[in-house]
Amino acid sequence: MLGLKGCLTILIGYVIAVCALFSSRGRNPSLTDWEKLKDQKISNIDNFGLTGQHLLEFFQENLPFLSFSEEKYRHKHVSLYYDVFKEYILRRASSKKCLPVDSAIAKLNKDVNPMPVHSHNDYWRKLPLFEGLAYGASSTEADVWNIDEKILAVGHNEAYLDPVELTLDKLYTGPLLEILDEVNCQDSDSDRKNGVFFNSPETSLFFYIDFKSDDNELTYKLLMEQYFKSLIDSGYLTYYDMKKDEIIWRPVTVILTGNYPTSLDILDNGNDNGYFESNQRFAFLDAPLLSLEPKYSKLSVAATVSFSQLMKHCGSDHWKVSLRGRMDSNEISCAKSIIDGAHALKLKTRIWGAPTWPANLVETISRQIIHDLGSDLLNLDNLFMASSLI
């Protein structure tokens, strides 16, 4: 018979084996797993079976092993992470196969519900456009600068622009066209277009274009005639129908913000029937939430205000709110009435510039903005936090 020590040894060995078995389940591939695939290239792998946040984590953890055998990644375009991720996501989009169920959108956000979150400063993310879509953020933004009167570079500061790789077409409009073509391949002539969210193809992505350059008329001309033209021709942009006097929703809704032109003469290219003389206007203005007029129901789909401006308008101060840790009942009542006014004009609302630190204050104010004020888009840099607040 086995002695006490023998029984304990067997028991301990059994426990270790069981723990090892269960620890290997439900996890991302490890270093050991990838060492077995040293001769495998990411370009030979169509689908890892991961979406959303899990896909992002997987790439971050295994990036060296996803790219070490690929000579084309020796010279980066944006970053090694971005280049590898984009190549994986868009691989099938460049093929002639029509299979929306295995599309870039399916890889990015299958089983991820769109959330009313604005991906603030999206171009600063490690994966511009793609990260927001993976989390299900239903709004994004790009700051654009006019370079040499022909290129729209994306960036926050003019001193750090890259007019070769970090451009509006390479980071946003090009990928958007590819992934939308991929999920609309079965009937490209249909008026019904599938959007960028697998679980909700009817949801339109709000795309804020923040004008940074002084010559906003030229920037707008480049947007219409160069950067958005293919999306317009394919029927992917929401537009205002001048004849029917209504907004026709499509997969992407362009909203002009920042130093944008407000003259209808510029917006419609001097025509009474729209920029392309089609009785359609393909860009909407970011309406001022504190000074709304009835005209914005046709010119806009969303209204915006900063948190500090909103609190000042309500006779308070954003510092008071921060020190208190939350908005009080008077501030909530005042702010909610303003947002209700925007909703009466059928406009969505966005409040930017809310406190960003500490985390508990951010969470409290964010919840109040969405649930107490009834604002439509939560404006946050941290998408992981945003996903837990909605």
From Swiss-Prot:
Signal peptide annotation: 1-26
GO molecular function annotations of the record: phosphoric diester hydrolase activity
Cystines in this chain: none
Alphabetical keyword list: Signal
CDD domains: PI-PLCc_GDPD_SF_unchar3
One GO term of the biological process aspect: lipid metabolic process
Family in the record: Belongs to the AIM6 family.
Name of the protein this chain belongs to: Altered inheritance of mitochondria protein 6
Origin species: Saccharomyces cerevisiae (strain YJM789)
Gene assigned in the entry: AIM6
